[in-house]
Each structure stands twice: as structure tokens, then as C-alpha cells.
């Protein structure tokens, strides 16, 4: 039995072709922080005939089962990533939407200190930092942050 079949069964989900195909796409390195619409387009590019409504339904099931994590970055649409990754935080460009994952031990320790100060036991947290790509590195607007000539 494949790992994906077992992952679905472990999550209490029936193994179906749409679930397997969507899980396969989510496992591709370039498909982290992917919207339902972009995942649907990727499936179409791969020749898969899975409807957009099915993609949304499966992503919601995966989210409920803990297979994916849903993020609501600025801009209003949800994006998804596999939940099997290590804890990390996110930097998000407000112009192009690029998402950079990072981990920082100092930030993690400071959060624990703040929680202890207020007598709170942390169970989970999410940290999103928003900004704009600098030095012309923005995919959406490469000239937005260059000095005027």
C-alpha cells in the first residue's frame, strides 16, 4: 500500500482518485502555499479531470483531518500546505504574494517567555510578517522598490 493511501486511511478518509491526485500535487516542492484555484489549474495541466468544487471539498476534508494547514494571508484567499512539515513562520510580500518560510530560535524563545510572563501554556502559534520585496526582487512589480533615476 502506498504511503498516500495509508495517510488517507490514517486520517479516516476513504482512498479515492481525486484525493490521491490532490495529495500528490501538494507534495510537489513548488506547490506549497497553493490556493485551491492554482491547485485546480495544476491538475488540469497534468491532464486530471477533477472539478474545482471537488478540489475545494477535498482541501476542506484534508484541513479537517490535519493533512494540510490552511493559511489566510493578506489578499483574502486561503492557501494550503502539507501539515507534515516542521514548525515555521512566514514572511509574505504584499505586492507579489511570495511566501518565505523561516524559523528563528530567538523568536520562538521570546514567545515562550511572553507566555510564561502571563502564565499561559502555549499549545500552538502562527506568525505572519508582511512587507514588500526589496531591491527589485518582486515578481509582481520588479521596479516598485528601485530608487528613482
From Swiss-Prot:
The family this protein is said to belong to: Belongs to the Fur family.
Instruction: Provide the organism lineage as a comma list.
Output: Bacteria, Pseudomonadati, Pseudomonadota, Gammaproteobacteria, Vibrionales
- Supply the Pfam families for this chain: FUR (PF01475)
Region Dimerization: start-end pairs: 85-142
Q: Any idea which GO molecular function terms this record carries?
A: DNA-binding transcription factor activity; transcription cis-regulatory region binding; zinc ion binding
Instruction: Please state what the protein is called.
Output: Ferric uptake regulation protein
Oligomeric state and interaction partners are given as:
Homodimer.
Which keywords are on file for this protein?
A: Cytoplasm, DNA-binding, Iron, Metal-binding, Repressor, Transcription, Transcription regulation, Zinc
Q: Which Gene3D superfamilies match?
A: 3.30.1490.190, Winged helix-like DNA-binding domain superfamily/Winged helix DNA-binding domain
Please give the GO cellular component terms listed in this UniProt entry: cytosol
Organism the protein comes from = Vibrio parahaemolyticus serotype O3:K6 (strain RIMD 2210633)
> Which parts of the sequence bind Zn(2+)?
33, 81, 90, 93, 96, 101
- Top-rank taxon: Bacteria
Amino acid at each position: 500500500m502506498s504511503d498516500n493511501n495509508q495517510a488517507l486511511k490514517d486520517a479516516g478518509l476513504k482512498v479515492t482518485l481525486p484525493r490521491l491526485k490532490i495529495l500528490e500535487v501538494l507534495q510537489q516542492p513548488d506547490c506549497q502555499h497553493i490556493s485551491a484555484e492554482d491547485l485546480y489549474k495544476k491538475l488540469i495541466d497534468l491532464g486530471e479531470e477533477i472539478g474545482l468544487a471537488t478540489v475545494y471539498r477535498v482541501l476542506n476534508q484534508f484541513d479537517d483531518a490535519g493533512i494540510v494547514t490552511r493559511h489566510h494571508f493578506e489578499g483574502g484567499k486561503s492557501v494550503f500546505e502539507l501539515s507534515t512539515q516542521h514548525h515555521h513562520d512566514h514572511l509574505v510580500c504584499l505586492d507579489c504574494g511570495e511566501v518565505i518560510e523561516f524559523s528563528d530560535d530567538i523568536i520562538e524563545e521570546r514567545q515562550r517567555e511572553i507566555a510564561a510572563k502571563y502564565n499561559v501554556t502555549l499549545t500552538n502559534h502562527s506568525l505572519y510578517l508582511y512587507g514588500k520585496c526589496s531591491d527589485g526582487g518582486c515578481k509582481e512589480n520588479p521596479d516598485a522598490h528601485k530608487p528613482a533615476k
